[in-house]
Amino acid sequence: MSSHPAPAPPVHDVPMPEPRRDLTPAMFTVISQVRARLAGRPELATLFTQCFPNTWQTTLEDLPEGRTFVQTGDIPAMWLRDSAAQVSPYLALCAADPEVRRTVAGVLLQQAHLLETDPYANAFNREPGNEYHFDVPAPGPWVWERKFELDSLCSVLWLAWRLWRATGELPLDLRPTLERILEVMETEQDHDGRSDYRFERPAEYCVLPSDTLVRGGRGAAHAPTGMVWSGFRPSDDACTYPYLVPANMFAAVVLRQAAQLVRELYGDAELAGRAEALAADIREGIETHGVTEHPEFGRVYAYETDGLGHWLLMDDANVPSLLAAPYLGYCRADDPTYLNTRRMILSDANPHYHVGEHAAGIGSAHTPGRRIWPIALCMQALTAQDTPEGRAEVVALLDTLARTTAGTGLMHESFDPDAPDTYSRPWFAWANSLLAETVLTRLDVIAERV
């Protein structure tokens, strides 16, 4: 009998380091101002004080050529999506704080560099390695994982747009990056006809069946819709139907933003027009193929569709999500179809919506069982309407978040709504940054109800 261990998926549980980067004076000012406004909510004030600097102090590393590596947390890799979200609460400081501007600009430089390395990968290594060497085809040495997630491309443009709006400049010429993104998206509008992308993971290395794609790595059967095909969701789970509506919503928004950017910054009307045309195709595809009638909730957005008459009616905590559509800029928070969709996904009609003794909210297939994700609770607060009921919802959600940290003072990936001391991923920087962003965005609402 062989003495070699049986093949198994990699396990990662990197401990959170002590703070390794000093806060800037502007960051101290933000923390002081928020704490003063939340003097009547000490739990939430403490939570913000620990979450706001978490990405800055524990996940960032300076690289050559002005680039910045952003570790996701207890997994030692950089996700394009996570890294953009992790630095999101610092963007408002970029105009006046040179160190924050340099660091966030370095994140964008690194993202553009990684896209050039492999535009189909979702996560990358700090140094050459091959953690998932068993995937088919095998990823390159700088690639942590090569799951094609449409929102990865969107996140780079999202960060570029917001940095440009905050500072009036960018650390690179964005046009080659945008051209590469357009090339991939246009190809994936006709995945079966034009794309060479495949992804398979041997069963013995899959944590969940959704770690691989069906049909020999091509994903589920589908027909062209104008939307962009995505193999995987932002949860890193395979799509059931390969037109992921929230990711396409994100794409429709960031492509129009990118068009404005390249037109105003570079005077490039041709590239801007190409991005706008793709954005229009995607939006038309969403509104034609990504909407269906629900017997209880009426006209709603589906989470996924295949262009063949099938719709998956659910939502997942990870962003982009249907819940996040107004946050992404796709629609207003009072849009009728969005409100119908919101009612659906915040009910037991969504298989990932859970109600427990201590919390109610959306979870993910990525964490099977009754688990709620703080990211979803934050997004619910960020997209609540500016009405008395909506403001009360915001306050209740943030109070829930402050009470369900298991005494750690930080956000986690997920927790049991009946026993919040049971949670996953003690160091998950994306969730910490989104909590900070939620408090900053909703501070007037929270403070008025102290």
Q: Positions of the model-derived regions?
A:
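Low-complexity, Ser/Thr/Pro/Gly-enriched N-terminal "stalk/linker" regions
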Residues: 2-81
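Long, acidic, intrinsically disordered low-complexity segments
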Residues: 12-45, 98-103, 181-183, 192-206, ...
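Well-ordered alpha-helical scaffold segments within catalytic/enzyme domains
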Residues: 26-40, 85-98, 155-170, 249-268, ...
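Extended, well-ordered alpha-helical scaffold segments
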Residues: 47, 98-114, 169-188, 258, ...
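A short glycine/serine-rich beta->alpha loop
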Residues: 70-77, 140-146, 240, 310-312, ...
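Aromatic-rich carbohydrate-recognition surfaces in CAZymes
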Residues: 76-104, 108-209, 429-443
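Extended ligand-binding clefts on enzyme/binding-domain cores
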Residues: 80, 116-120, 124-127, 131, ...
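C-terminal capping/lid segments that line or modulate ligand- or cofactor-binding pockets
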Residues: 135-141, 146-149, 312-332, 370-450
